[in-house]
């Protein structure tokens, strides 16, 4: 009897492999999203309009996946995994298993920004994030935007905003774009191309707080600069979701294996 906690891409592939190795075993998959597994990097493509909604779900819909792989989907929030007891505790009770796999993934990380209204703050990782972002863009009430984080997700959000004709600033505390993914020489070439599209780049700086006066919203930066900002995209990074196994396994920036 197997339990898989989390049903993103990793959870999906784990379930497929378990079923391949054990044709008869019971597999319970815990997921509180109610959605098929999806690729978080595809959410910006949907927001841009390059993908239809279904395109975010590369493995098909839930009904199709369940039919192909044969598992039980339990739409419950897992509260705690008790490793020594082989127990999964949920909001509705608990269940014992022979083997438990943790595939909870990560969530977007965003520190609070003083003065930033919730309706003007946008993350970009989940399907819900993409739907919310797209709905706001349809209102045509955004003239200026600030995106924090010169990451892959950040530049894709900038691309979406640029498509809608929104004047956009991309900020990062690092000294150049894609600091974790590109050599400085390559990054500088990318920066030239991004700026050629009319995007403003600012490095070594981030947002300090938001101010609003007479309906005009302004992002005040850590160097004192002031930028008009109707919305703020927070693409700073992710944090591993480890709450369910706290105290049960060794945890660093994620689960240590």
In which residue ranges do the predicted regions lie?
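Core beta-strand elements of the Rossmann-like FAD/NAD(P) dinucleotide-binding domain
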Residues: 90-99, 222-231
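Phosphate-coordination loops involved in phosphoryl transfer and adenosine-cofactor binding
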Residues: 1, 75, 139-144, 204
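Residue-level detector of alpha-helix initiation sites
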Residues: 8-12, 34, 106-108, 128, ...
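FAD-site-proximal beta/loop scaffold in flavoenzymes
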Residues: 117-138, 218, 226-257
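A conserved short coil-to-beta-strand element within the FAD-binding core of flavoproteins
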Residues: 75-86, 203-215
């Amino acid at each position: 009897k197997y339990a898989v906690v989390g049903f993103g891409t990793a959870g999906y592939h784990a379930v497929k492999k378990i079923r391949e190795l054990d044709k008869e075993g019971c597999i319970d998959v815990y997921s509180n999203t109610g959605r098929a597994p999806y690729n978080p990097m595809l959410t910006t493509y949907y927001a841009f309009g390059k993908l239809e909604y279904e395109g975010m779900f590369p493995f098909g819909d839930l009904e199709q996946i369940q039919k192909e792989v044969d598992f039980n989907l339990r739409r419950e929030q897992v509260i705690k995994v008790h490793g020594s007891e082989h127990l999964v505790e949920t909001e509705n009770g608990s269940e014992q298993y022979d083997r438990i796999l943790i595939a909870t993934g990560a969530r977007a990380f965003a520190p609070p920004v003083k003065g930033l209204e919730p309706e003007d703050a946008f993350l970009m990782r989940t399907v819900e994030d993409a739907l919310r972002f797209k709905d706001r863009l349809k209102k045509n009430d955004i003239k200026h935007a600030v995106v924090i984080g010169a990451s892959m997700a950040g530049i894709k959000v900038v691309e979406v905003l640029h498509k809608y004709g929104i004047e956009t600033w991309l900020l990062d505390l690092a000294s150049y774009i894609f600091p974790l993914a590109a050599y400085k020489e390559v990054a500088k070439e990318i920066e030239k191309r991004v700026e050629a599209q009319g995007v403003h780049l600012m490095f070594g700086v981030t947002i300090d707080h938001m101010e609003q006066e007479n309906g005009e919203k302004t992002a005040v930066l850590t160097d004192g600069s002031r930028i008009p900002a109707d919305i703020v995209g927070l693409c700073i990074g992710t944090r591993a979701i480890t709450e369910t196994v706290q105290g049960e396994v060794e945890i660093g920036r994620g689960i240590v294996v």
